[in-house]
């Protein structure tokens, strides 16, 4: 396994440019699992779980809420927690240290906007599903 990591590191060092694809696995490694009915979800969204039977973030994003107010209560809490209160963690910081000096472009389905705060150039990050911070009611 260690040899594999050395080979990957060497390939990164020798590459002229990098195309980085990032999806839920990266967020999960940072502790944000949109599929999980975990401690974090129950702590921050337990009221939505009790009231509507929502068991994870993904269900909450696509749930048919009875009112716009209840829908935006969920969305605004999610945006506040994941995009403003929680900062990117060591996985994102290490990724930037590993590749940030290279010519790169990132394509991601992650919407929590954790690439730019660690140093990645916003113009080199394409969030194909948008950014939660750009949501509008």
Task: Describe each PLM feature range.
Residues 1-137:
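Conserved catalytic core of sirtuin-type NAD+-dependent deacylases
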